[in-house]
């Protein structure tokens, strides 16, 4: 276990309350609740309002569920298969600017997708759901097996579910089931430039 989380400056409580556990209950996720999470992601800011994100998902019990589980790295399959939904976040490398007809490249798609994921995660938390982002995905297979258009990039996987008891996990994963802490502000925010060594 770690020490309790606390903010050094006043912020909205959901920023420190949200975390990424791996144990889920068997509760199912309705299409309406999932769409509320996508609605939050929809309103994320992006460079030139290009909105380069695309979410492809399956809910547990659907015909596509086993395929979506298999697109995770084996380590993540072991616990994420119990989630209520699995979502893959993909980015598109181009967008059509306002007033234009031809696609233009964007070099900030991954950055914008990260913001959209953050909005989704916070919305899920506000609704009592867990959204756990995962880098351990079969990125190449996601592109081909989910039929993504040319140029798309698989960014992350997201497991969504209700928080379950830690006993649902293996002993190895139980040891990792705690709220992680964060670096202090002075380690990453510098006025006027980087500090001299």
Residue ranges of each PLM-predicted region?
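Acidic, surface-exposed loops and disordered segments
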Residues: 1-197
């Amino acid at each position: 276990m770690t020490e309790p989380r606390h903010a050094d400056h006043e912020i909205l409580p959901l920023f420190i309350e949200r975390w990424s556990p791996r144990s889920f209950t068997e509760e199912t996720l309705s299409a309406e609740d999932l769409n509320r999470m996508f609605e939050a992601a929809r309103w994320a800011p992006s460079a030139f309002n290009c909105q380069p994100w695309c979410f492809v998902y399956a809910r547990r019990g659907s015909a596509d569920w086993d395929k979506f589980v298999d697109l995770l790295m084996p380590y993540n399959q072991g616990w994420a298969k119990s989630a209520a939904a699995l979502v893959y976040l993909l980015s598109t490398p181009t967008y059509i600017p306002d007033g234009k007809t031809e696609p233009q490249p964007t070099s900030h798609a991954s950055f914008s997708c990260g913001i959209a994921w953050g909005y989704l995660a916070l919305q899920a938390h506000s609704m009592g759901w867990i959204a756990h982002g995962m880098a351990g995905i079969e990125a190449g297979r996601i592109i081909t097996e989910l039929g993504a258009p040319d140029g798309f990039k698989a960014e992350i996987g997201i497991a969504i579910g209700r928080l379950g008891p830690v006993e649902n996990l293996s002993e190895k994963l139980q040891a990792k089931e705690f709220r992680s802490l964060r670096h202090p502000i002075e380690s990453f925010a510098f006025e006027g430039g980087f500090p001299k060594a």
